[in-house]
Amino acid sequence: DVYKRQPFPEMWKEIRRVRKENAPTVLFGSEPFSSLLRCGNLEEFKYDWVWEKSKASNFLLAKKQPLKAHELISVFGKGRTPYYPIMEEGEPYGNRTKRGSNWTGIGKVPNPTFRNENRGTRYPRSVIYFKTAESEGKTIHVNQKPIALLQYLIRTYTKEGDTVLDFASGSMSTAIACIYTHRKCICIEKDETHFSQGEKRVRNEYQYLRL
């Protein structure tokens, strides 16, 4: 059984042990893994983001299936989790609302017309576009995520001064995104080579910002 071979029960047990009561858990994935991930915790599953990438992959299978140009970002949490939507810029618009007429003792009196103005800001949609990590420079991990995307997610679910945990930190892009957004970060990585490379990357970035 594919599902039973996944370490989801142990993973969720540890996540619940260390996270705050209403803190969201945000996990990257692709199918069929993402479906298994959601089914492993349907009670806390909230929704998915779809990350539309600037660069597609799976070129070796291009004659058999579409190129893969997206990744899923699944959000979990207990109860009402923090959410600070980052508004998108668009064209300003306005709606007119007319509320009919009223009859009085001297005849029909029209109600005023109300106009709802919007300067163009819109709430985010579930599909978000970000360039891949290669656009930000040399990558050191096969699954390295772009810092810009991680900053977006961090700002969406946390406030300045909060602590972010990345228990599969790889290149430690999350730590760098936390530096830029003034959050604290705890990184965990079981591969010593990746950890060493990621730590060096974070130190270099931190020194650069201090100059």
What are these regions (language model features)?
Residues 1-195:
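Core catalytic lobe of class I
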Residues 205-211:
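S-adenosyl-L-methionine
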Residues 202:
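Conserved hydrophobic residues forming the short capping helix/wall of the S-adenosyl-L-methionine
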Residues 198-199:
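Conserved SAM-binding loop
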